[in-house]
């Protein structure tokens, strides 16, 4: 698992940008089968998750059936074996190599985005935006569904990985709208 930052970075670097409706990547089989099985084996028990509704990050109308496990804050809630596993994943996704692969892949998009900030965006982000990363597992027990929405102004990249334990729900996921 020590080479995750290289594997993850190579997946980004070797993928083609899809431009419609906006620049993005769609990568099938991002995780190799054996590693995917390890992920499944190491998903924390639901008791370790927090209701997103209780985090103060969403409105009171948000689904009470959605839970979050922060891979930065919540690792001490789980057994050492799982903690070590998720630390390795964090090290891959939060590595300099992964950031360089991603920012290089989207260099034109980033340049265009930050050269054309509106006044409102500048007020929120500042002249020189500060970049931070967060990783989390999200679990939904009813119907994972969010209506059409824009993302937060202060997000540069979002990486969404669907981790079903079987193929029953293989046709659901994220829809992109113009």
Show the residue positions of the predicted features:
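Short, flexible segments with low predicted structural confidence
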Residues: 7-11, 73-74, 123-125
